[in-house]
C-alpha cells in the first residue's frame, strides 16, 4: 500500500521527457516515489490521500549558494545602500561579520541557523548549500550542521578554510588544520541527506595559495568533493597583481583544484575561453542573480547553457538576498540575463542564440533539476520519477495573486512571474511532510523566531554591534523619520 497519494495535481516531473501531467498523481512509499502519472493510473489504496486540486506538485527547490549563519544579517542591505563598489562593500561587511560571528558558538549558531532553515522550508526548498567560513568559534559549524540535521532538509555543506590579510588571526587556519575539522564533521554529520566537504571561499582568502592544492588533495584522500566559491569581483586585478595573466578558472586549474568534481559557486567573471572548458570538467555551477544587480554586470547564463551546463540558483544568504524566495530568484535570473545581454551588445558581442534565452521552463529546471545536480544530489532528487526520493512540494495557485491561469496554459509563467513564498502549501523530504498548510511540522515557529532574536540581541550587546545598527529607537531620528 502507498504511504501518501497526491491526487488531482498539476504535476511537473522534470523527468527526462519533461512530462507534465495536467491532472496527475504522485505516490510515495517508504520515502521514495512509487509512481507518477495521470489520474487514471493512480494506485487504488493509500494510507493518506491528499487532494491537490488547484495545486502544482513539483520537485523541491535547491538553494545552491548559501551561508547559513548569515541569516543573522537580514536587511543589512538597507544599512549599506547604495552599493556602487562591490569589492569595497565586501570589505566593509567582513568587519561586521567577524565581529558578530566571534560570539557565535555552536549553541547560538544552531538557534540562528534554525530560523534561516525554517524560512527556506516555508519557501519550498528541500536542499541547501552552505559555505561556513566564520570559524573563530570552532564549534560554530557543528551548530549550523546540527540545525540542518534537525530540519530534515538535505545539505551540501562546505566547511571552508581561510587565511590572509582580510581575515582576523583568530579565524585564520592552515589547510591541514581545516582538513582535520572537515574530517571530524564528516564523521559526525555525513548521512543520506547531508554531505560535508572541504571548502575554498575564493582565491583571495589565502595567505598561501598552495593551500588550495592541499585542500584538493585532502578532499581526494577522504573521498570527498570540493567546494569553491568561484568569483572574482576584482575582474582580474587580483590575479594580475599575482603575476597571473589568465582567468580564475585557469588559476584554480594551475593548483589542481579542478582535477576532480567540484561545486563552483557563482562562476562570476569567467573569460570567454574559460566557458569553452566547462563541458570538459565536472564543475557544477550556482548562479546568484541578485549580486549581478549590485554590480550591474548581469548574468551570462547563456554562456553556460551554450556549453551544456544547467546551473543551479542560489540566494547567497539573507545578507545578500534578504528575500530567500525561489520564485523571486527565478524572476531575477531572467531579468539579470537581460541586463547582461544589453551590456554585451554595448561591448560589440552578439545576442544569444534563441535556444539560450531564459524562459519560465528553463529557470524552473535550474531551480530544481539544476540545483540537485549542482549539489551532487541529482541521483536522489531534482525530478519526480519512480525510485527517486519523495522530495517535492505543493504550490497553491488557487489564489488571487496567481490567477487567472487561462485553463492552466500559463502555469509555468505563474510559478516564475507571480508566485510568492506564501504560495507553498506543503513540503516533503524523503516522503516526510515538513511543511503542511504553510506551517512547520517539526518546529514551533514562534519559538524559533524568538530564540534567534534573543541570541542576536545578546551578541549585539556583548560586541557593541548594537551601535552599528540604524538608530530607529524611541527618541531618535534617522533619515528624516522621527521615532517616538
Region locations from a protein language model:
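N-terminal metal-binding scaffold of metallo-dependent hydrolase/deaminase domains
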Residues: 1-44, 55-56, 477-483
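Divalent metal-coordination and catalytic microenvironments
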Residues: 9, 26, 31, 54, ...
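Active-site gating loops and adjacent loop-to-helix segments of metal-dependent hydrolytic enzymes
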Residues: 72-109, 164-175, 233-261, 332-360
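Alpha-helical scaffold segments that flank or form the walls of functional sites
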Residues: 76-131, 136-153, 178-191, 453-455, ...
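Metal-coordinating catalytic core of metallo-dependent amide/deamination hydrolases
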Residues: 134, 139-273
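His/Asp/Glu-enriched, well-ordered alpha-helical/loop segment
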Residues: 254-261, 301-399
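C-terminal cap of metal-dependent C-N hydrolases
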Residues: 389-449
